[in-house]
Amino acid sequence: MTQRERQILQLIAANPMISQQELAEALGITRSSVGVHISNLSKKGYIAGKGYVLRSGSYCVVVGGVNVDIGGASFGALVPADSNPGHVTVSLGGVGRNIAHNLALLGQEVKLLSAFGEDIHGQQVAASCQELGIDASHVLRVPGGTTSTYLYIADPQGEMVLAVSDMEICNQITPSYLAANLSTLQNAQVVVTDTNIPRESLVYLAENCTAPLFCDPVSTKKAEKLLPILHRIHTLKPNRVEAELLSGVSITSRQEAEKAARVLLDKGVQRVFLSMGGQGIYAAQADEQLWVDVIPGKMVSTTGCGDSAAAALAWAYMEGLGLEEAARAYVAAGSITMEAAETINPAMSSTLLQSRMGL
């Protein structure tokens, strides 16, 4: 699905009686172009018959953090208590938002459940979601709230010297907020969550969401929130240290990684994709286990590889792919992401991903 098609579907979902002329005016395109897009959506099965009857269950919900990253890198040695000439960058991030962004690039319909303030940064995030075709209509806008912000200062070599993280607004992603959006969650093909949301909200998802639940542990500290709900998780994507925490198994070899995955399966997780860095990915479910090597290539930056991998796993599930193909999608997404300086490689697409997978 193209970004324009996703935008049209969102407008139709909000107003099933909308006319093609109204769609054209809302998107700034011609009526004939709208007709072509609607015809394509009908051929692809997203619109069933006349009257804009939308196919249900064909979307992914991402629950998690939205972040604005503000970074300053000095041109010379940092001088404390002084104004240092340098370069300042502002970029959009957050694990949940990054996963949603990658899924949109992979052609999936995405709905985002998150929270941000009614400040300039919140406006930037909302505009970005609209441009990408991510449905942010269910996002909680907090009056007077500050959109989650990460501020850091780096030296000329790019090493972080000091940082301040303001993610308090993520605490607004409460069980009551999720309950208000339960029908959206229940009708999804898959729900992906990070662990930036409160512990009780993760428990709510585990106990009330009937759609398959995919979890990105994010970090060892935040992964601990998943311990009480492992038995309700469909797909878990830990790295080595996160898997150690969740399984209680010390991992220093492939054999120990396999043991940790077995423990997690015994705890109720249906699928485990355990990253061992350069040693590859161990994918396991009850009746199948395998190793998939990383794809060698030019590495520019590894930032964002985990987020794209989580998106690739959700994409693979939505496309009906098996365990091995999902694992190959995981490593393929990482190889694409690391080729760009940006956290999200704008070249990401389902065509490129499948090519990298060897399909």
Kindly give the residue locations of the regions a language model identified.
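Hydrophobic anchor at the start of a short beta-strand
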Residues: 109-110, 136-137, 213, 272, ...
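Conserved N-terminal subdomain of the carbohydrate kinase-like
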Residues: 56-57, 78-87, 105-189, 353-359
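Short, conserved phosphate/pyrophosphate- and ester-handling motifs at nucleotide-, phospho-/glycolipid
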Residues: 103, 239, 306
